[in-house]
Amino acid sequence: MSALRCSVCSAPLHPDGRSLRCVRRHSFDLAKQGYVNLLRAGVDAGTADTSEMAAARADFLATGRYAPLVDVLARVVEASGEPEFVVDAGAGTGYYLAGVLDRVASAWGLALDVSAPALRRAAKAHPRIGAVVWNLWEPWPVADGVADVVLDVFAPRNTAEFHRVLRPGGLLAVATPGAGHLRELVTELGLLDIAGDKTDRIAESLGDHFEPVDVDTASHTAELDADEVRKLVLMGPNAHHLHRGGLGAKLDALTGATEVTFEFDVSVLRRKE
């Protein structure tokens, strides 16, 4: 991973046995699960996905309910030409990045996420993924102008770092829930509501560094059994709010099947020179 930089001094990192090391001898051990933690300090409780959330996400995404979103993201990466390096900011378990790399044989991927439990899975999700524990709100340990595409799927958006790590003319794909996403569960279970007009606000917030290219939407409905609904809820931010409105009790009481809408918006933007 020659694109990685030391999180202490910003010098290039190079493999040294089971570690990554810079010329100033700052060293970071590779975990046996295949990822590296470059954080300099601990993370506040609640900001990272837990082991339980990562497990629920892996199980639910394996059902293929979010495969249409992978298709959209893969088309964006393919449209960038012959990409060599894709950064997934907030990669989680690596599901989306692995799906993209399956379609784009020329590319390697870097999964950045603050959750070590999630990155244990991301590191094994695809042979061309490198996984790094990092807080996306901090300057990333990645060299300038090395990425052909940056993916941001339901994750924090650090505009300055998007711009810095992308090559001139590189593409940014920001995936957000559509207005109808999980609407049945929002009504039935009282999930956190989905904000409207996100795509307009994304283009506006990134406008100083990026120009809009396209907005693509993928939507479908599927019948989920009670266990699938539980995993769907527990893999995301609602897992931090199980006591809100008795959500945990409502999940425990679920029986039968529920028709659920899945809707994803992908805003594609190009890095300004």
Segments from the language model and where they lie:
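Conserved class I S-adenosyl-L-methionine
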Residues: 171-201
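A short glycine-rich, Lys/Arg-flanked "PGG" loop and its adjoining helix->strand segment in the class I
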Residues: 159-171
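A short SAM/SAH-binding and catalytic strip from SAM-dependent methyltransferases
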Residues: 147-161, 176
